[in-house]
């Protein structure tokens, strides 16, 4: 009889563990799909410019760009760097961080030389995919930090989608609907990267930290190379408040989830 009880107990524990893993699997898909869907949502807002041009004065557009920069900075300061420095020594921290910046620099040079419509799509993926990988791996260790990172990625992807769609449609023959469709397909990469981070990388804490710092270094380069210069508008002082708002929302999210 005791052996039967032990067998039943082990079976229940295994079943509970399987259910927990399945629930985490579904949550990660949701957490990575929402930030991905934010890209086509932001792109669809760019299409409203043709309907109501007065809504999209230059000050509003620059404020939206600045908001995305603030959200990106929040991701670096509140999630990626704190998670990244946990498991690495100072030398590796510096190497991973600067490697991310160097990789984004090389990508920026390559995209500038090519100057193709796909450049904007590649630029968006270059920070979205590493962040989704880090999200999945982080969720395995701290669910609160994973939720926070998902929210911050969504905040940054809305203005990124908006800005990228505007640039693509203005320089090519592609319509807003076509760009929105492309961004929607890109959103599916989020769950793939997130699940990879959760099931493959979560057991390698040093590698997760390295990826987080790599993404942080690249994003910081991106902020000051591309986003901050676009946010500045001569004789207008309100757009930088968008960056403050983006960062503040990241801070409030951190407070709310207790990460």
Question: What do the predicted segments below correspond to?
Answer:
Residues 2-259:
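Intrinsically disordered, metal-sensing/regulatory segments
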């Amino acid at each position: 009889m005791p052996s039967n009880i032990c067998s039943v107990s082990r079976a229940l524990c295994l079943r509970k563990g399987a259910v927990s893993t399945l629930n985490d699997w579904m949550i990660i898909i949701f957490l990575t799909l929402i930030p991905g869907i934010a890209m086509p949502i932001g792109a669809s807002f760019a299409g409203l410019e043709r309907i109501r041009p007065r809504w999209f004065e230059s000050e509003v557009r620059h404020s939206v760009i600045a908001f995305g920069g603030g959200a990106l900075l929040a991701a670096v300061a509140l999630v990626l760097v704190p998670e990244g420095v946990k498991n690495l020594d100072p030398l590796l921290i510096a190497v991973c961080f600067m490697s991310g910046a160097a990789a984004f620099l090389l990508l920026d040079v390559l995209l500038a030389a090519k100057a193709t419509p796909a450049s904007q799509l590649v630029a968006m993926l270059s920070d979205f995919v590493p962040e989704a990988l880090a999200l999945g791996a982080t969720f395995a260790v701290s669910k609160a930090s994973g939720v926070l990172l998902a929210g911050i990625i969504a905040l940054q992807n809305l203005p990124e989608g908006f800005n990228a769609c505007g640039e693509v449609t203005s320089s090519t023959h592609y319509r807003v609907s076509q760009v929105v469709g492309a961004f929607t397909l890109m959103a599916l990469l989020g769950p793939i990267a997130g699940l990879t981070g959760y099931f493959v990388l979560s057991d390698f804490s040093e590698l997760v930290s390295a990826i987080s710092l790599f993404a942080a270094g690249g994003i910081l380069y991106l902020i000051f190379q591309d986003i901050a210069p676009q946010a500045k508008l001569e004789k207008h002082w309100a757009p930088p408040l968008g960056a403050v708002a983006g960062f503040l929302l990241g801070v409030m999210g951190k407070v709310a989830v207790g990460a």
